[in-house]
From Swiss-Prot:
It catalyses: NAD(+) + (deoxyribonucleotide)n-3'-hydroxyl + 5'-phospho-(deoxyribonucleotide)m = (deoxyribonucleotide)n+m + AMP + beta-nicotinamide D-nucleotide. Its EC number is 6.5.1.2. This is DNA ligase. Zn(2+) binds at C430, C433, C448, C453. DNA ligase that catalyzes the formation of phosphodiester linkages between 5'-phosphoryl and 3'-hydroxyl groups in double-stranded DNA using NAD as a coenzyme and as the energy source for the reaction. It is essential for DNA replication and repair of damaged DNA. The active site is at K111 (n6-amp-lysine intermediate). The gene is ligA. GO terms for molecular function: DNA ligase (NAD+) activity; metal ion binding.
């Protein structure tokens, strides 16, 4: 046997052994035999580096120091899930599904508490792994994901596919990692999720390989070739992916709830952390029929487990002003450990929330983390509230008190008493600019409407530079606050006039950081226009809405001149967003700001736009069967270039099916529905 054949044999053998060990949990060889074969392969590859295969198991052992992580733009939108916290909320979601789908069936899966990622395979080989990021743009973490031993570098079939899943750190590995960190004098990780996220952002791949991350894959992001979610998961197992076996088929709310109760009981016994249950409509065609909101699919929901709670005391309440002028109360509390992190502050939302719960200073309260993330005050422990005291105070000479008759002097030694009042003082003036606060009838928030309020301007600048908006690395809240205080910037357009010399006048900003910030500002000019639109901070316009708006109007200038009626025609966007967008661009200064940003060289075009004037413009097309000339990704790109929306399943909304060889149930269903059928050659002839 020649060397190339031997390397091929060893690579295939070791990959099969790894599949049996990590995926099937049925090892067929002893560790010693695996190690012997592995070291034999390492030696042969070192002597013959030109023969190393892309799926070699030696890629998993680390040894690469990365310079950083580059951005990766996902070809498919990676939506987050809506969530519910009770059976009643779940019932409302299920009721909405039943209004659209007759006798829906569901798949219930455990919600893994880890880091979401996407894996891209071409011809069966792993070519890219990326974090979800904001659902549109993530980070390329391919080298690190290759060090996760249960991620197949080569699939059982030579196909193109994009899959979504969760990377997590098993509890046993988490305990081992923290024990090692304590011995080294390093701070322990707060929880396995933080450890998993931190591990995947390591620049040294040896550290990733050592920590023992694992994965569960659960969704095909590229157009699916199966008819149900259940079939997708079974297909993933056949391809070599790790799929969570803890799942249940359900036909109604009662059966869904049975699985949730079972998952709740199992939660502490599992070798990994979960934070809920994901419920999905099983039929993929029905998923497509239900569609999406701006942020999430209508065909799936996440039930979140009741949050862990802790008792603490409210010490005081701060009021802060956000970028839209909303004044938000935050409780300062006695620090307490909650969900494995120390919490000393919690949001109180708004005045109504404080008054409804009768929250007072020095109250004992129960706090929890909504979705295990944001600390919130849940319940006031009224039985532990101390009765109000009478305070006695002696005023010295030359002091004054206010009475309804005006100010009067207090003689030395005069004593008076008053009743202690621990109720939270509701502000009537903005804590930043002293303008009168307004409480609009249709809102629960207190709002500062002064457009020159320094807090609002500062927060708008911070939002503009943030990761989900223009992503200007290095330009964080501290730097922006200093720039604003020194009057070096007064609006977002001023950021594009900054120089290294300007930045060097700030505290803790040295030459290297200043150069990095100026470079990041310059790079942000090339961002797609939906990032800029989101960065402008228009009320009700989040990242998803910004993308939908720019997909429709293609250019920020065109959007700025659109009417409410035109915007309201966009699916998933309502009148509230339309009114907010039109109102923003009608305000004094909006046109001037756009002119300044355009003159500064910012991109106003939506970079994801396709030619929508093609012969398939607005048509929904499904690919099915085996293509002999085109790769599936090439066929999809060709269809999209012709204006088509490529879907993964056949429904009444499908306009056309392109059927290759061995097309199965999708072709049959299309024929039953009378949908137009094309061959691969028909597509090639265009």
């Amino acid at each position: 046997m020649n060397i190339e054949s031997k390397i091929k044999e060893l690579t295939d053998q070791l990959n099969q052994f790894a599949y049996e060990y990590y995926t099937l949990d049925e090892p067929s060889v002893e560790d010693s035999e695996y190690d012997h074969l592995y070291h034999e392969l390492v030696k042969l590859e070192q002597e013959n580096p030109q023969l190393v295969r892309a799926d070699s198991p030696t890629h998993r052992t680390g040894g690469v120091i990365l310079d950083g992580f580059v951005k990766f733009r996902h070809p498919y939108n990676l939506y987050s899930l809506g969530d519910v916290f009770s059976r009643e909320e779940l019932a409302l979601w299920e009721e909405r599904v039943r209004k659209e789908i007759v006798n829906p069936e569901y798949i219930c899966e455990l919600k893994i508490d880890g880091l979401s990622l996407s894996l891209y395979y071409e011809n069966g080989l792993l070519v890219t792994a990326a974090t979800r990021g904001d659902g549109t743009t993530g980070e390329n973490i391919t080298e690190n994901v290759k060090r996760i031993k249960d991620v197949p570098l080569k699939l059982k079939e030579a196909i193109d596919i994009v899959v979504r899943g969760e990377a997590y750190l098993p509890r046993q590995n988490f305990a081992k990692l923290n024990a090692e960190r304590e011995l080294e004098g390093a701070a322990p990780f707060a929880n396995p999720r933080n450890a998993a996220a931190g591990t995947l952002r390591q620049l040294d791949t040896k550290i990733v390989a050592k920590r023992g991350l694992a994965t569960f894959l659960y969704q095909e992001a590229s157009p699916a070739t199966n008819d149900t979610q259940e079939e997708v998961l079974e297909y993933f197992e056949e391809l070599g992916f790790q799929v969570n076996p803890e799942r249940k088929f359900a036909r109604n709310l009662d059966e869904i709830w049975e699985f949730i109760e079972e998952a709740t009981r199992l939660r502490d016994e599992l070798p990994y952390d979960i934070d809920g249950v994901v419920i999905k409509v099983n039929n993929l065609a029905e998923q497509e029929e239900l569609g999406f909101t701006v942020k999430a699919p209508r065909w799936a929901i996440a039930y979140k487990f009741p949050a862990e709670q802790a008792e603490t005391e409210i010490l005081s309440v701060d009021w802060t002003v956000g970028r839209t002028g909303v004044v938000t109360p935050t409780a300062n509390m006695t620090a307490v450990l909650l969900a494995q992190t120390t919490v000393a502050r919690a949001t109180l939302h708004n005045v109504d929330y404080i008054q409804e719960k009768d929250i007072r200073n020095h109250d004992k309260v129960m706090i929890y983390k909504a979705g295990d993330i944001i600390p919130k005050v849940g319940k006031v422990l009224l039985e532990k509230r101390k009765p109000a005291r009478h305070l006695r105070k002696t005023h010295r000479a030359n002091k004054y008190v206010w009475t309804r008759f005006g100010r009067r002097s207090v003689e030395k030694g005069l004593v008076f008493s008053k009743r202690e009042d621990n109720r939270v003082k509701i502000p009537t003036q903005c804590p930043e600019c002293d303008s009168d606060l307004i409480h609009f009838e249709d809102e629960v928030a207190l709002r500062c409407v002064n457009p020159l309020c320094p807090a609002q301007i500062r927060e708008k600048l911070i939002h503009f530079a943030s990761r989900d908006a223009m992503n200007i690395v290095g330009l964080g809240p501290s730097v922006i606050s200093q720039l604003f205080d020194k009057k070096l910037v007064t609006d977002v357009a001023d950021l594009y006039q900054l120089t290294v010399e300007d930045l060097l006048t700030l505290d803790k900003v040295k030459e290297t950081l200043a150069q990095k910030i100026v470079s990041a500002i310059a790079q942000s000019r090339e961002n797609s226009a939906e990032k800029l639109l989101f960065g402008l901070g228009i009320r009700h316009v989040g990242g998803k809405a910004a993308k939908l708006l720019l997909e429709r109007f293609a250019n920020l200038r065109a959007l700025s001149q659109a009417s409410e009626e035109e915007i309201s025609e966009i699916p998933s966007l309502g009148g509230v967003i339309a009114t907010a967008v039109v109102s923003y661009f009608e305000t004094a200064g909006a046109k001037t700001l756009l002119d300044e940003l355009e003159n500064a060289g910012l991109n106003f075009a939506y970079l994801g736009a396709v030619n929508v004037e093609g012969i398939l413009s607005g048509k929904t097309v499904v690919l099915t069967g085996k293509l002999t000339t085109l790769k599936r990704t090439e066929a999809k790109e060709k269809l999209e270039a012709l204006g088509a929306n490529v879907s993964g399943s056949v429904s009444k909304k499908t306009d056309l099916v392109v059927a290759g060889e061995e097309a199965g149930s999708k072709l049959t269903k299309a024929q039953d529905l009378g949908i137009e059928i094309w061959s691969e050659q028909d597509l090639l002839d265009l």
